[in-house]
């Protein structure tokens, strides 16, 4: 089936993938997403501590780290689900504190897939996928249906189009969530631990879809502990702890030659099982 979206002029053009260890930023080329000295507090708890990061179009970035290290907070600040307290975040040159302009750049450029699937239970799969394009983009309903059919085919569940979320497995629901985000034609996809709520036998079907998406050139920022996925698709792997970026590098160096003690300890624990 032909992609019903207009051609993406830049989203599928991989940027140079930078490497760095222990540093707080990973530049290289023009950054589509830029964070500078970002802090985030929840009361007295500092969830993000002076985080700087650049992500170029086409890059695939994996963020890992122990529970409470700030991974999900970082990705939620990028999508404006949390508001950072200090520093600056911009997407495509637009600062996220810029009111209506920030909302527009997020709506037009950023898709997000959560740990929980967040599908509307009272809507069919077709309705879940077409609601955003029709309501937010003003797309013709028939065109929106074509989008839904195309992306359900891409995530390998076209036969589920008329079902409701409760009739699908967890893995199928997460694939619907991915298809729903893609229907909005984002330039970057954010994934917040997309497999952590799934039964083990369903994890691979979601990871397979994510790998195929990465192979199309989609810009991806993934919070995950699936290290096999990171080794396979990431341009850069970032390790966070205590709200800081402790280390970042290309996968081969990150996994085979980690520089920081905290990174070494984390990898020894997570790769031992």
Task: Show which residues each predicted segment covers.
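ABC family nucleotide-binding domain
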Residues: 28-253
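ABC-family P-loop ATPase nucleotide-binding domain
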Residues: 1-39, 273
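C-terminal boundary and immediately downstream tail of ABC-type ATPase nucleotide-binding domains
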Residues: 2-4, 8, 248, 252-273
């Amino acid at each position: 089936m032909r992609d019903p979206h207009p051609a993406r002029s830049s989203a599928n053009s991989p940027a140079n993938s930078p490497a760095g260890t222990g540093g707080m930023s990973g530049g290289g080329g023009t950054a589509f997403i830029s964070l500078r000295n970002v802090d985030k507090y929840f009361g007295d708890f500092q969830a993000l501590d002076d985080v700087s990061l650049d992500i170029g179009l086409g890059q695939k970035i994996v963020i890992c780290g122990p529970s409470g290290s700030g991974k999900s907070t970082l990705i939620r600040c990028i999508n404006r689900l949390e508001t950072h307290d200090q520093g600056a975040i911009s997407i495509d040159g637009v600062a996220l504190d810029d009111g209506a302009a920030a909302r527009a750049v997020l709506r037009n450029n950023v898709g997000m897939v959560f740990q929980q699937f967040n599908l509307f239970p009272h809507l069919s799969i077709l309705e879940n996928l077409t609601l955003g394009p029709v309501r937010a983009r003003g797309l013709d309903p028939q065109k929106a249906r074509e989008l839904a059919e195309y992306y359900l085919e891409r995530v390998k569940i076209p036969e589920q189009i008329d079902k409701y979320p409760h009739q699908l497995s967890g893995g199928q629901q997460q694939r619907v969530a991915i298809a729903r985000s893609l229907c909005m034609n984002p330039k970057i996809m954010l994934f917040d631990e997309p497999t952590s709520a799934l039964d083990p036998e369903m994890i691979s079907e979601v990871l397979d879809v994510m790998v195929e998406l990465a192979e199309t050139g989609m810009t991806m920022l993934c919070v995950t502990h699936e290290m096999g996925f990171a080794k396979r698709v990431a341009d850069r792997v970032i390790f966070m702890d205590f709200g800081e970026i402790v280390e970042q590098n290309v996968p081969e160096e990150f996994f085979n030659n980690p520089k920081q003690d905290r990174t070494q300890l984390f990898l020894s624990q997570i790769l031992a099982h």
